[in-house]
Swiss-Prot record:
Protein name: Putative DUF21 domain-containing protein At3g13070, chloroplastic
Superkingdom of the organism of origin: Eukaryota
Entry keyword set: CBS domain, Chloroplast, Membrane, Plastid, Repeat, Transit peptide, Transmembrane, Transmembrane helix, Transport
Membrane topology listed for this record: Multi-pass membrane protein
UniProt feature, compositional bias: Acidic residues: 560-570, 630-643
Annotated transmembrane regions: 105-125, 162-182, 213-233, 239-259, 285-305
CDD domains with a match to the protein in the record: CBS_pair_CorC_HlyC_assoc
Ranges where the CBS domain occurs: 359-420, 426-484
SMART domains in the record: CBS, CorC_HlyC
GO molecular function, one term: flavin adenine dinucleotide binding
Subcellular location, record wording: Plastid, Chloroplast membrane
Organism field: Arabidopsis thaliana (Mouse-ear cress)
Record-annotated CNNM transmembrane domain positions: 154-340
Amino acid sequence: MMGMALELSVLGRSVIDSKTLNLKRYGQKSKLSGRFLPRAELHCPVALSSSKHSNLSFRFRRSCEFSYRSRFMLFSSSQCHEGSQRKSDSGEKELESIKVLLKRGIVIGALVCGVFLYGCQKVLASAGVVEAGYEVFGQSVVLFKNALPKIYQVLTVLREQGLILAALLSLSAFFSMAETSITTLWPWKVRELAEKEPENGVFRMLRSDVTRFLTTILIGTTVVNIAATALVTEAATAIFGEAGVSAATGLMTVAILLLTEITPKSVAVHNAQEVARIVVRPVAWLSLVLYPVGRIVTYLSMGILKILGLKGRSEPYVTEDELKLMLRGAELSGAIEEEEQDMIENVLEIKDTHVREVMTPLVDVVAIDASASLVDFHSMWVTHQYSRVPVFEQRIDNIVGIAYAMDLLDYVQKGDLLESTSVGDMAHKPAYFVPDSMSVWNLLREFRIRKVHMAVVLNEYGGTIGIVTLEDVVEEIVGEIFDENDSKEEIQKKTGYIVMRDEGIYDVDANTSIDQLSEELNMKMPEGIQYETVSGFVCEAFGYIPKTGESVKVVLEKESWEEDGEEEEGKQERQEPKEKNQIYRVEILAGNARKVSAVRFERVNDMDQVSEASDVKSMVPKFVRKWSSEEDDGNLSNEEDQSENAVLDEHVLADNSKKQQ
């Protein structure tokens, strides 16, 4: 008696030449009988009907497959020795169990992937998902069998040309590492390394003609990449026909990016010096062959640039911005201190700094009349202890010379009468005059040439507006300098101060710079050519020199809004002003008819006070009006109105009520 166990699966094709078989459902004890119409080596339709037993004797194969993709495993129940039959059945069951587990694992894996990709409901609702999975697996096996000849051809080609391809890719990786290591090193770094080497050192070779190395690397990279691509394309076309071009393109793109570009260049960036020591000498040898070709290409490219009207740059240089980036990187890495970084950046910016930005204004200048005696000069020196004092005639803005305290000591040692000698007699005349638009860099050079330490600053109309000293110039580089005789008041007068009295309340010296106050309040302070200090900002807000006790409300923009960048401009415009602006009440603490000395900034938390105040008028800084008027001279009034609405964040709301001290 023969039987068959039925299992839903996908297997290879085979046929049984019997019409009816005893079937035993896999994993169950009940049996089925089946009828089918056999056809040699083809799928056969089958009809199954339930029955208890149906014993037949026939010749059969071990397995068969029908159009319903059902697999039958045959077993014998008679005409065999019982012991040998048990062994055969045991081996077959173990083999079939392994196959079943493998197939079920594939099905479960497909189901899990389907759940993650399409969702549980879609996967479970798909009709015939298991059968489809088996079908795909079967097709994959068939495709693999059909592809075996092609794979054999590919392996044959790799065996014949693989070494050539590997050599070309290795050369391409070598050139990529060489290029990155050379370009990563700054020119000044190459010069520094070359000075520490002997005459035949690699960095001396690199410093002598870096263009020669870069040209050789460029030509070598181009040649080996083209050769490798052509080799793979030829082999792929011979194997796959026209489809080989696409296959070769995709393969070489991945290979070149991964093996010859990204990986080698990443190694060279992190080990520039070490890689350069290895690659420079081989590249120098290759340049003997490739560089002549490169020179021809260079001349051709220069001719093209000349035709286009462009000029090439012969030697690389480092811009000021690049140098600042290097300084920031060095500071972050700990190579230099933050103070050192600030000093170097100040040196770079000193050419763009004007004398009027560092001078002492005339109102703060301590000067002496030329008709005063040396006794008066001695008394002034005891009080202020300045080594140099400007000397004026009749009025303070008419400075004629500079009096030195060292000369006063000479008169004392000579025993001359101090009362009978005037300051004008001992003053150094004439004084050195400089325009307020002069750069600090040029002023420092003039101080060195003229061997003077003080100059009188004039405006464009020839009026005296202040003095500038060598100490002022040095302080622009190293920061404020104080000596042991400077009092607390003098230090505050020189640098300004910001004292936080309470939450949101700041007492500010009027000499404090706008940048310093903006950083402390984290607000965007309006800036213009009219003022650079808090005193100028306050006078701009009031429109006149305010008296002690007067107050004004100003609307300032939060600094964080400016830092968000242009991407958030549309979002910012949709926000309410109270979300991005802040009101400050500015009160004058000290001052006189000529200037403001101290100011208090008090944060106002209720932004609605702006709309509720009926006695408040909007004031636009003059420089904003000036910019607006330049846009359209024909519609001046309309442009000014639009500018007032557009720069609401910088508007100053002035309170008409004045508080008297």
